[in-house]
Amino acid sequence: MMRPHHKFWPARLPHAITPPATSLWDNLAISARRYPDKPALVFFGRTLSYAQLQQACERLAACLQSLGVQKGDRVLLDMQNCPQLVIAHFAILRADAVVVPVNPMNRAEELKHYITDPDARVAITTADLAGELAAASDALPAGQRLQHL
């Protein structure tokens, strides 16, 4: 079927693509095997190799699973851009859970929606943002609150 925008489409590009069958976690694991000592993250002059990144993600994923996170569970991720955000994101994926990204500028009233709408029970955040998330959780009925923050 010819869509209206296809008449402007470059001839060398296909109209559709088939996404790869590998997950983001698989891509990280493959990179960690191929390039264990290569830099994966560089942040304020500190470097984390692919092997170190994978190990940190595996540890946090195991922690999430020990808290009861199961396949398909939603986990809030409320952080500024930093290596811990990347580690937490991949760890949630490794635990077969779903990442629910949260804008760190949100306040308690807005955060309540992030907790209740996806039915999240676990959140990963930093100390500077934990107060707002805790206030949001505490303002909810007991059955809707976060179990782990």
Q: Model-found features: residue ranges?
A:
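Flexible, non-catalytic linker and terminal segments flanking ANL/adenylate-forming cores
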Residues: M1-A21
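Residue-level signal for pocket-adjacent positions within structured domains
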Residues: P4, F8, P36, R74, ...
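A generic short-segment signal for beta-strand/edge and adjacent turn/coil regions
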Residues: K7-R12, G45, A91-L93, T116-R121
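Conserved AMP-binding/adenylate-forming core of the ANL superfamily
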Residues: A16-A21, A29, D37-C82, V86-F90, ...
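Structural core segment of the AMP-binding/adenylate-forming
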Residues: S66-L67, R94-L149
